[in-house]
Amino acid sequence: MKQVFQDARNAEITVEEVPAPKLLAGCVFVRTAASLVSAGTERASSEFAGKSLLQKARMRPDLVRDVLNKISRDGLMAAASAVRSRLDQPSALGYSSAGIVITVGEGITDINVGDRVACAGAGHAVHAEFACVPRLLVAKVPSESVSFDEAAFTTLGAVALHGVRNADAKLGDVVAVIGLGLLGQLTVQILKAAGCCVLGMDISSERADLALHLGADAVSTSASGFRDLCLQRSAGHGVDSVLIAAQSASNDPVNLAGAVARNRAVVVAVGTVAMDIPRRTFYEKELDFRVSRSYGPGRYDAAYEQKGIDYPIGYVRWTETRNMEAFLKLLADRKLDLQPLITHRFPITRARSAYDLITGKTPEPFLGVLVSYPQNASEDRHIRLSTDRRITAHQSVRIGLLGAGGFATRTLLPAMKRVRGIEMIVAGAATGAHARYAAQKFGFRSCTTDEKEVFSNPEVNTVVIATRHHLHAGQVISALRSGQHVFCEKPLCLNEAELKEIVAAHRDATSALLMVGFNRRFAPLAIRMKDFVHAAREPLAIHYRVNAGFIPADHWLHDPLQGGGRIVGEVCHFVDFLCFLTGSSPAEVETRSLPNPGWYSNDNVVCTLRFRDGSLGTISYLANGDGGFSKERIEVFGGGKIAVLDDFRRLELHGGGKNNIFRSRFTQDKGHRGEWEALVTAIQAGAESPINFDEIVNTMLATFALDESRCLGQPVRVRERELFNSDTPSATAGIDRAS
């Protein structure tokens, strides 16, 4: 399918051929008929992308702080690599579209194939021939009388409608609308449908005249004239509410809003404007200033938008979905007239012309700009980018990738590209945009949104799994059953039931190896550290401090069904590293948590592990620290020796009266390249996994036990991997509570 992208470096607009998106549970698959180009949001995005790095830094000091923190924590080269990766990845544009439902995902019961729908959401309702959209970002078009062109306005219409609701506009109110662009014109019509007296202001006489034509009671093109108009139409009191629908870096719209408002009026910022509130005016009038958030309650709530958990209507009357439905109902009842707002239509092949228009490269008046789509577009989920095999003497490990998110494209794939003997065959991701980006940047021959294309591809002998955690187990099993080697990013799975299935699949796949991305054990300084302490030949005491950093409670990693929580999803890394250093496996574990004040997610924990060789380890995994401080520090004591590894950049070795310091050259090295060099060597030699499969199972069993201990508040014994492999019917056979 064709999709519109923007280059983050220079704002160039391109139309690319990408695989159609994968249909996900709780989503609908839509053939797009029309989409709306937002003259506000998308123009601002294009203008920002077109600025120099220095200009971007001045506009987004928050991003500069993030980069500086990364430099102090990970080093200059790692930070530069992360910035380049972010800039290299093109942005998918668009957030308001309409079309016909082609397929519905699991769990969808109220949307049917063939339904005409409006779609919303950045990353979902994009400018593309097909879209996969979560259910609560979809609204049925209620009547055939509403065209696809009109329905494509629904997202922006919901933004305007939510602004009106925030203004508490009532029948008979006098309401001012500042800014009569597309958002302002929709706001004017919605207010008139609600029975308000509407006064509009825009410096463009053409837009002011259009607002009059669409129902505004009076308009003005100057600030002084608008102040007089508002006093005249409100019996000298000032207006009851003001909606700022302008896009401006100036504070003039907010100043004007304060000037025309009556005492205790409501001022709502719907557009993007400067908000340096004039205190004296707003204080003396006791004005209520509100910022209207997008298209209503539910926006930016992953539980609502991604999981489809609706808010009860008795508690939240107007969610974003219900705002979309209300706007469509106004269209069906002919309370709104959108035809005068549509000034341009472009086929998707000419999308660049649409952006030239809204960014001013084409000097021509515009308002509503639509993108149209052919109705015979291909739904192919697999795109071939090249046909030459480029076989080298070192070609052996032929990669099929599943998952092309931030970690894969910024860390994993760059490390793989530096290892000889790897050939990139097919890149798979849930969206065509991510799949194509990974394929083009890292030299894959083709890209797909259908994971079956990876498992069935005869050229792929090694599957790399870098998807979200809840998908790992099923994909690992599918690859093993296809006879393919597997590299799975951590965690291997989310629970013991999944682990038992993987153990069985691995037992049956006699010719395939399985490796998990426990990369830290392959870091050069980690190997030097182990060699040093291993000579002690006695149990070790290890303290591993992880300054993990805060992530919001609604982040997918905290979701037990999708991310598994931070203990399962991340602490497994550090459990493996302790197993690596001791050469043993945990026998008993205990997890204690700090009291949760409400904004953390049980991710401030201290884990204690007693190993079968007598070693003791503690992992302090903390989300309550300063993100600018170093992330990881490991201290090992044993046999009269001490080893300290600081953030995989500096290693201190103390023993026998000697003190030695080693540093990682140029940048932090956490072993990502090393793990792939070891894996390629193993595959080429027909050897077992660089991390023994029993060790992987033991690490996951210990991790599950740590999570269990956190819930129980008591120590938990971890059975040996051999016992777990027995044919016990229990799904939790690997864990024993300690008495």
Regions found by a protein language model. Give the residues of each.
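C-terminal capping/lid region of NAD(P)-dependent oxidoreductase domains
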Residues: 4, 236, 241-243, 268-271, ...
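Mid-domain Rossmann-like dinucleotide-binding core that forms the NAD(H)/NADP(H) cofactor-binding site
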Residues: 123-124, 149-224
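Beta-strand-loop-alpha-helix segment that lines the small-molecule cofactor/substrate pocket
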Residues: 262-263, 462, 473-518
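Rossmann-fold NAD(P)-binding glycine/threonine-rich loop
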Residues: 270-288, 292, 298, 492-513
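Contiguous beta-strand/loop segments that form the cofactor/metal-binding neighborhood of enzyme cores
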Residues: 353-356, 360-384, 569, 575-650, ...
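N-terminal Rossmann-like dinucleotide-binding module
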Residues: 379-442
